[in-house]
C-alpha cells in the first residue's frame, strides 16, 4: 500500500514537472517569409500573427526577410525564403516560365488597383483615356491598366508593334508626386496607399475621379501566399519531422488568424505595424504622418480581405471563377500563351489550414 502511494506521488511530481512551463519547450521550426514590399499595413495580418504569438502556437519561428532588389518569386524559387507574398500576375507568369511556384492562399480577394484623374480634366469614363498620358508602374505592375485600356479598344506606347498608340504610357517608380498631375493625366494608385498620398499632395477626394479596375471587370488579384512544388513535396521540412505541406498549413492558419484579428482590431494592428517600418510608413504632404497614413491603409486593405459573394466567410480562399477570369485576362493580353497547369494552384493547404472543404 505504501509502495502504491509512493508510486502515485512520484507519478504526480513527474506529471507536474512535465506540465511546467518550459519543461519540454517545443523546438520551433524556422520559416522564412518574403513579403512583396516594405513593412506597412498592407501586411498587417502577418505582423499581428507574429506579435500575438500565433506562429509560435503553431510551432513556427517565422522570420520576415527585408525587401530588396529581388522579387519574392526569386527569393522563394532559389530557396532563400520558404514562402512569400506576391500578385497573381507575377505568380502565373513565373509558373509559365518554368519556375515551380504554387499558390496556397488568397489574402486579398478584390483588387485595390485604380487609375486616378483630376475631375477638372473632364475624364469621366475609360473611353476618355484616348489621347491621354497614363502613369504606370514597371515590372508587371502595369498589367491591370493595360488590361483596362485593351478592354476599351485602346492601344498603348508599351506595345512596340503599335506606331501610333491611343495612350502614352509613362512608367514611373511608384511615387505619384513624381508625375501627377503635371506629367500624366491619369496615375496608377492603390486604394490603400497612393490615393492617400495624392490626397496629401493637396487633391481632396472630391477633386478626384477614381477608376477602380475591378469595377470594370479587371479584378486581377493581388496579395496571395505562395511557395514551391519542392517545399510542398518535402517529407521532412528542415529536419522538423513534419512535411512541407503541414508547415504550409500551419503558416496559413496562423496568418489568417492574424488577418482576422487585424481587420477587427484595426487601431491595435496599426500600433503593431508602426514600429516595424519607420519612414516607409509615411504618406505625402499633409498626409505624411505615419500613423494617419497607416490608419488609412489598414481600413482600405480590410476591404480587400475576405470580400465578395462567394468568398465571404472563407478567408484565404481563391474563388475558382475569379481565377479563371484572371487567366483569361492574362491570355487576352498575350502575357500568358496558354492556361497554367493544374499545379499552379493548390487548395489542399487551405483546406488543411481551415478544416473546410474548398468550394469548386
Regions found by a protein language model. Name each.
Residues 320-360:
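Conserved C-terminal helix/tail region of periplasmic/extracytoplasmic solute-binding proteins
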Residues 236-335:
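Secondary-structure end/capping motifs
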Residues 1-10:
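Bacterial N-terminal signal peptides that target proteins for export
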Residues 9-18:
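Bacterial N-terminal signal peptides
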Residues 19-25:
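Sec/Tat signal peptide C-region and signal peptidase I cleavage site
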Residues 89-90, 172-282:
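Pocket-lining segment of extracytoplasmic ligand-binding domains
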Residues 26-181, 185-192, 211-213, 218-219:
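Short, glycine-/small- and polar/acidic-enriched structural segments
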Amino acid at each position: 500500500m505504501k509502495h502504491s502511494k509512493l508510486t502515485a506521488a512520484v507519478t504526480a511530481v513527474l506529471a507536474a514537472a512535465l506540465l511546467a512551463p518550459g519543461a519540454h519547450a517545443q523546438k520551433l521550426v524556422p520559416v522564412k517569409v518574403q513579403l512583396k514590399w516594405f513593412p506597412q499595413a498592407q501586411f498587417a495580418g502577418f505582423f499581428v500573427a507574429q506579435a500575438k504569438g500565433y506562429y509560435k502556437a503553431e510551432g513556427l519561428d517565422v522570420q520576415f526577410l527585408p525587401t530588396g532588389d529581388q522579387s519574392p518569386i526569386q527569393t522563394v524559387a532559389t530557396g532563400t525564403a520558404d514562402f512569400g507574398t506576391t500578385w497573381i500576375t507575377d505568380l502565373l507568369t513565373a509558373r509559365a516560365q518554368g519556375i515551380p511556384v504554387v499558390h496556397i492562399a488568397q489574402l486579398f480577394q478584390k483588387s485595390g488597383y485604380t487609375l486616378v484623374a483630376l475631375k477638372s480634366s473632364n475624364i469621366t469614363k475609360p473611353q476618355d483615356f484616348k489621347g491621354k498620358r497614363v502613369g504606370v508602374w514597371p515590372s508587371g505592375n502595369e498589367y491591370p491598366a493595360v488590361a483596362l485600356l485593351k478592354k476599351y479598344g485602346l492601344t498603348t506606347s508599351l506595345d512596340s508593334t503599335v506606331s501610333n498608340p491611343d495612350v502614352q504610357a509613362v512608367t514611373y517608380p511608384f511615387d505619384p508626386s513624381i508625375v501627377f498631375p503635371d506629367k500624366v493625366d491619369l496615375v496608377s494608385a492603390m486604394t490603400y496607399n497612393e490615393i492617400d498620398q495624392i490626397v496629401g499632395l493637396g487633391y481632396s477626394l472630391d477633386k478626384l475621379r477614381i477608376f477602380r479596375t475591378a469595377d470594370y471587370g479587371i479584378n486581377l488579384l493581388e496579395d496571395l501566399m505562395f511557395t514551391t512544388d519542392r517545399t510542398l513535396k518535402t517529407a521532412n521540412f528542415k529536419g522538423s519531422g513534419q512535411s512541407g505541406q503541414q508547415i504550409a498549413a500551419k503558416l496559413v492558419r496562423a496568418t489568417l488568424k492574424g488577418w482576422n484579428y487585424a481587420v477587427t482590431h484595426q487601431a491595435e494592428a496599426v500600433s503593431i505595424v508602426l514600429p516595424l517600418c519607420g519612414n516607409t510608413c509615411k504618406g505625402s504632404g499633409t498626409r505624411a504622418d505615419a500613423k494617419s497614413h497607416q490608419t488609412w491603409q489598414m481600413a482600405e486593405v480590410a476591404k480587400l480581405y475576405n470580400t465578395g459573394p462567394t468568398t465571404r466567410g472563407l478567408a484565404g480562399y481563391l474563388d475558382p471563377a475569379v481565377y479563371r477570369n484572371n487567366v483569361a485576362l492574362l491570355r487576352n493580353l498575350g502575357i500568358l500563351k496558354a492556361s497554367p497547369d493544374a499545379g499552379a494552384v493548390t487548395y489542399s493547404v487551405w483546406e488543411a489550414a481551415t478544416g473546410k472543404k474548398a468550394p469548386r
